[in-house]
C-alpha cells in the first residue's frame, strides 16, 4: 500500500443494485462519473471495474504515514470512497478495486 493506505482482504461482499446497474449500463454510469469529475476524461466507457462496495474486510498491511489505530487482522468496513483519489468510489470507479477481488486498498481515515 502507498502512503496513507491500508491493504485489506475481502471477507464478504454484498451484491448491490448499483453493481447490477453498472454491469448493465456502464456507459450511463461512467457519463455521470465524468460529469461529476470522479473519472478522468481519458477513461472510456469500456473501462474495466472490479465491483464490490458493500463489504467486510480484514486489515492485512498498512502503508507509510498511517496511524495504525487498529491492529492487523482487525475486521473493518468503510464508506466506499477513496479521499486520496478525489472521492473515487471503491468498487465502482475504474482504477479502484472493489471487494469482489481478494485484496483491495482503502484510505486510512
Regions found by a protein language model. Name each.
Residues 16:
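Short cysteine clusters
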Amino acid at each position: 500500500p502507498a502512503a496513507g493506505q491500508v491493504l485489506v482482504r475481502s471477507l464478504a461482499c454484498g451484491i448491490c443494485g448499483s453493481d447490477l446497474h453498472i454491469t448493465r449500463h456502464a456507459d450511463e454510469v461512467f457519463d455521470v462519473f465524468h460529469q461529476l469529475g470522479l473519472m478522468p476524461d481519458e477513461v472510456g466507457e469500456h473501462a474495466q471495474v472490479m465491483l464490490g462496495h458493500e463489504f467486510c474486510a480484514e486489515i492485512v498491511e498498512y502503508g507509510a504515514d498511517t496511524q495504525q489505530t487498529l491492529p492487523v487482522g482487525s475486521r473493518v468496513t468503510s464508506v466506499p470512497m477513496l479521499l486520496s483519489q478525489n472521492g473515487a468510489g471503491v468498487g465502482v470507479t475504474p482504477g479502484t478495486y472493489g471487494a469482489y477481488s481478494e485484496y483491495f486498498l482503502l484510505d486510512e481515515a
